[in-house]
């Protein structure tokens, strides 16, 4: 039997095409709670973040302003209307959650759309662009660099750079938790959703090893 209608969605990164979001969100239809595990998520495509965020709001939402040397359009989330998810949302983050992952987590806090639990995020959100170069004549050597071109300012007027997102509930796994593969963060998220599962059992739901080898894929786990 399904336990409480909770869907856990582990998202290793936002480096997937925005068109794939539709199929992922459809899995959440009919569930009363969606737990988004963004722990270890380094970020990804801005267009994917914008499309993804739009599924959680009934109206278009400004995600953040971009502050650069020249005027820039803000990051916007266009509401997906009836195709969106209207249930409870719980977001898990840690010190390795960066860029798009922490921007999304902070957006959910500011709009009072979800609860964020875990550890303070990385505080690495500045937007950058890649620049490529070639050197040499007979033997061409290609190299490149990323140049920061804008800071990201949230709706409260603050940047997350160097500060990160402070969770609504700070829960940091201990060394013993990690050694024994317990997950007190996911356990607490499930408790908020109305399901009591101890950290040891929660640690078996989303094993860390499962996602180290599949960082380019989005994994979905339904609690049964």
Where are these regions (language model features)?
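Hydrophobic, well-ordered secondary-structure elements that form the walls
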Residues: 108, 157, 189
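A broadly conserved detector of short glycine/acidic/proline-rich loop/turn motifs that flank catalytic sites
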Residues: 12-13, 95-96, 120-121, 149-151, ...
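Short acidic (Asp/Glu) and glycine-rich catalytic loops that position anionic groups and cofactors
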Residues: 31-33, 164-171
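C-terminal structured "cap/appendage" subdomains that terminate the fold
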Residues: 130-132, 137-162, 166-167
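Flexible glycine/proline-enriched surface loops and loop-helix/loop-strand junctions
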Residues: 86-88, 170-174
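Residues in well-ordered beta-strands of folded domains
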Residues: 10, 64, 117, 146-153, ...
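Conserved functional hotspot residues or short segments at active or partner-binding sites
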Residues: 126, 161-163, 176-180, 184-224
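Cleft-lining beta-strand/loop regions that shape enzyme active-site pockets
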Residues: 1-138
